[in-house]
């Protein structure tokens, strides 16, 4: 059973650690509008729930559907947004030229690179599928003031490759392996957080 959002918020509050943050990903598909919520009302409802829980400063909202992120940036600038991208056969929300239904009117052809698209959209955090990242993109994004996160990085070789690229964060189902790789490199490790359901 998936917990309701209110249950998740209650768990976070019970943990009692103000450093505990939430990353909430919207699952809206502009290619299947009859199967998912409309982005603007959904984003507004999500913002209201986060604010009502008093967790706006501890929550980031992620989405492949940038329309959602544009609404959140307008309605709740205090809530960080994270621009998700994939440029794969199984999902390409960025496209190769004109704007796609995913990118809220921002087009690769108009900006020349994904980091520039995200910057133009008002984004500050880019979370890319790890297999799409290279050193030049990471460097460009960071020079534009973007934080770069890589997802979902579970294999030791992939983790090492992302650390070599200098990404700002790694999304992983195996945080133990990420921490081990960071420790081997002498990188500072964040303290763990204990949460009892």
Regions found by a protein language model. Name each.
Residues 83-84, 91-197:
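C-terminal active-site rim and adjoining tail of enzyme catalytic domains
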């Amino acid at each position: 059973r998936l917990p309701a959002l209110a249950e998740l918020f209650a768990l976070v509050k019970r943990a009692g650690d103000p450093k505990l943050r939430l990353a909430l990903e919207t699952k809206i598909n502009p290619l299947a509008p009859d199967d998912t919520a409309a982005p603007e009302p959904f984003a507004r409802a999500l913002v209201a729930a986060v604010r009502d829980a008093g967790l706006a400063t501890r929550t980031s909202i992620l989405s492949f559907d940038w329309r959602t992120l544009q609404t959140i940036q307008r309605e709740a600038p205090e809530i960080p947004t994270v621009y998700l991208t994939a440029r794969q056969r199984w999902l390409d929300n960025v496209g190769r030229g004109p704007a796609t239904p995913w990118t809220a009117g921002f087009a690769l052809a108009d900006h020349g690179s994904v980091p520039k698209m995200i910057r133009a959209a008002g984004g500050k955090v880019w979370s890319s599928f790890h297999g799409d990242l290279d050193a030049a993109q990471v460097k460009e994004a960071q020079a534009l003031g973007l934080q770069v996160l890589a997802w979902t990085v579970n294999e030791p070789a992939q983790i090492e490759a992302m650390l070599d690229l200098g990404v700002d964060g790694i999304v992983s189902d195996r945080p133990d392996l990420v921490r081990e790789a960071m420790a081997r490199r002498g990188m500072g490790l964040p303290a763990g957080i204990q949460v009892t359901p």
